[in-house]
């Protein structure tokens, strides 16, 4: 489903992929291009296929798009089924950002506010993101009290059970962007 957002320009994509030489990056470029203007993106791939690099560039493009449309920097959230997985994604994004900034063709300074927004994103379990009430049941964020997030990335999405995924989808604002990341060959919960 497309949202009423401005499309990312080819110039923006060239800036994000400046100096690229790997064939695999054409698929990454296509994934980033497809994410812009959509409310839901599913990114799959096995270990070492560049999912984290793609997510970083996708978040930068989505952040830039959000700022262009709203005039505000987005509220970004990073989550995973486990705290360890969420922290691993946050650390991988930090390492990817360092590589983007120190390569032969670092991204331009106009991308830095978006880079800072991505790196400042809170990493949490999906339960914590939703404000789990523990043994009392339910979540603080739901359809009546939506999650204060413009862009949400969930890593290892195949490990989410259907109840938790339903709660997450129900807690998102109508204009929020959800990026589900995972390995199609990973065992589901």
Predicted regions and their residues:
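Conserved ATP-binding/catalytic motifs of P-loop helicase motor domains
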Residues: 1-189
